[in-house]
Amino acid sequence: MLTAHHLDVARRHHAILRNLSLSIEPGRVTALLGRNGAGKSTLLKTFAGELTGGVAPNGVRVTGDITLNGEPLARIDAPRLACLRAVLPQAAQPAFPFSVDEIVLLGRYPHARRSGATSHRDRDIAWCALERAGADALVGRDVTTLSGGELARVQFARVLAQLWPDDEAIESGPRYLLLDEPTAALDLSHQHRLLETVRAVAREWQLGVLAIVHDPNLAARHADTIAMLADGTIVAHGSPRDVMTPAHIAQCYGFAVKMVETGDGAPPVMVPA
């Protein structure tokens, strides 16, 4: 399990996260919801090990405990951490004309037998990851020529390749996938396809997934658990049906909604009141 316990994060004198506790369970998808600036990306970066205890040069101070499979996250060295968790950050336009294949193969570098060397097995995994991400038609393309949605699918394939299961991965214990707005650049169809894939690999590979999602309806449709972040802490946490209520939405977003049942057994859909 990937766990934050009594986490506080502040930048100089501004508190971002306050006494926050949250666990990401293997085999389940947790969607993180909250307003812009609520601290969602900060929480994800802390889970990723990008923000560690003490005071960083940029003035960010982190206190509290983060553990991965019971081990303090700060004690896990970078090579081993890269085999235990993968991070998909918010989309950024690439500066160099790498090929799609090269970008996805980056996900295999933590597993290379020697520095910078990838094997036929790694290339096979990269191809399978592209297929799983619905990006196999983009093989050979220059990533600087891709649309935002195409690039998002390629980067998703990269993190799938990084966590692709093998005997060593199984022996290392549960692994984790951290996604920062993975659907932001995607059209409606690809949003649902990506999150369907996320939920499928979470179950098949026993991945713990934390995904920042801006659309509460999308999160409710595809997540096992929803965590709502407001005022620097988790204000609601549980199943989509339990968490997606007008009261919780108002507390999290300051916006009045009503819930409409879809009739297909899925959680209700949120619409403006």
Swiss-Prot record:
GO molecular function, a single term: ATP binding
Task: Indicate how the chain sits in the lipid bilayer.
Answer: Peripheral membrane protein
EC? Answer: 7.6.2.-
The main enzyme category here is translocase
Report the residue ranges that make up the ABC transporter domain in this protein.
Answer: 2-256
Question: A Pfam family name for this chain?
Answer: ABC_tran
Q: What does this protein do?
A: Part of the ABC transporter complex HmuTUV involved in hemin import. Responsible for energy coupling to the transport system.
Q: How does it assemble?
A: The complex is composed of two ATP-binding proteins (HmuV), two transmembrane proteins (HmuU) and a solute-binding protein (HmuT).
Q: What is this protein called?
A: Hemin import ATP-binding protein HmuV
Q: Which organism is it from?
A: Burkholderia lata (strain ATCC 17760 / DSM 23089 / LMG 22485 / NCIMB 9086 / R18194 / 383)
